[in-house]
From Swiss-Prot:
GO MF assignments: acetylglucosaminyltransferase activity
Keywords: Glycoprotein, Glycosyltransferase, Golgi apparatus, Membrane, Signal-anchor, Transferase, Transmembrane, Transmembrane helix
Name of protein: Alpha-1,4-N-acetylglucosaminyltransferase
Free-text function comment from the UniProt entry: Catalyzes the transfer of N-acetylglucosamine (GlcNAc) to core 2 branched O-glycans. Necessary for the synthesis of type III mucin which is specifically produced in the stomach, duodenum, and pancreatic duct. May protect against inflammation-associated gastric adenocarcinoma.
Gene3D superfamilies named in the record: 3.90.550.20
Residue ranges annotated as Lumenal topological domain: 26-341
Domain notes per entry: The conserved DXD motif is involved in enzyme activity.
Amino acid sequence: MLKEIYLSLSLVLVFACGLLYQLTMRSQCFFACLPPFSFPQGLDGLLRSGRSIMFIETSERVEPPPMVSCAVESAAKIYPEQPIIFFMKGLRDSVQLTSNTSYPAFSLLSAINNVFFVPLDMERLFKDTPLFSWYTKVNSSTEKHWLHVSSDAARLAIIWKYGGIYMDTDVISLQPIPEENFLAAQGSRHSSNGVFGFLPHHPFLWACMENFVEHYDSTIWGNQGPQLMTRMLRVWCRLKDFHGLGDLKCLNISFLHPQRFYPIPYPQWKRYYQVWDKEPSFNESYALHLWNYMNKEGKTVVRGSKTLVENLYQKHCPKTYRVLIQGAEGTVSKKPGTGSR
């Protein structure tokens, strides 16, 4: 009897220690810790779920600015049952980040249960894809737009390998995207690469990676990004004009209406930083691309300004607004993320 009591107490102690360890690691872990029961295969199982929302940072920056934080938080809010994975080149096994005031955005995102930070190892990522030979030969130090070009390449490889949805880090999610294989239209005959989604190993993305290498010219802005998606879509499909708000379908790829992600086109990007008499509902949109790369003036989200962008932050990324806008008096990094177009 006494032996059984000791055994029971030992099991309880082991369980309690394990729970305490998980809680401790959750508050201090460098990568947001993997849920042990949902993804028994660890990181590989997480990635290969095929349902993840992916973000990428190809610079060495590890503390997301407010707009990036808002993009990630809003995605986690809209897709609570799906992993939100943020690939960061600046993450290393040797780097030690802790949850403290030096990294407020990293801390608040790490505390969200379905957000995970993952190191971006591009050589490993590109292995077994058409991009590997290009990556091992290219001289990144001579590339004018390397951060953006490498981001264009990485997003193709990630979604081809693992499936899921890629989003730029200046995209605020509003409602779930119901499509599996899709591209986002900026116009009737022009695709973006700021938001797209595919099932794993989709042949369209393999063809995109081949074209990326065959027609590589990083001196032309967008040649490896939206222009690549557009020219490949034209090979696969006979593009037609949109009629009304309906999406287009080509083979098993949906070409989504510009209203889905770009209700405010890039020439009018400043409207996000203006006060509207009547705020738009964006009922036809799945997410909003804020065109942060166009923001050369360094416009910021200002607390109490009642601008459209402030209202979007308050509604769709309230933690980011509270910690990084209210807590920092509206200061926003003037440097766009490498996942911003």
